[in-house]
């Protein structure tokens, strides 16, 4: 069963990277503090953009940033689809807005959006979008991801294990931290 063992080891590495990604996002969220709730007035796309613009204005005012300073926005991966389907409904045209259309809207607001996995996942078998859309917003360069040397070992054999025909198939570790810069 070498193919099965290889597939499982590969999937273990992917799962490990997802867990690290979740920890990095959680560290950023913790550093940013408690989120501000925004009472929406209507459609998902306009409410989301308005909430982010208000948050962005507050950040620009607090740090006295240029009005054209790029702000980083982190949202769950499914947020793009929420925005696209809402724009489709609002525009009343027969074509679905593209990823570029959504990016252009945020680009016009000087926001660089990252759609991420491993944070605020959709419940299994969802039939409706969540009622709230969490977002992290901060000036570009506010956080640095720190890493240390990585050790990956595979197929490690030792004398005691050889006697009973076992080996270490996979061992990995990674040192990761998030440092706030401002």
Residue ranges with predicted function:
Residues 4, 44, 94-102, 121-122, ...:
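Alpha-helix capping and helix-coil boundary motifs
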Residues 18-25, 65, 115, 119:
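Intrinsically disordered or highly flexible coil/loop and linker segments, enriched in small
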Residues 101-121:
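A generic structural motif
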Residues 116-182:
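Extended, compositionally biased alpha-helical segments that mediate assembly or anchoring
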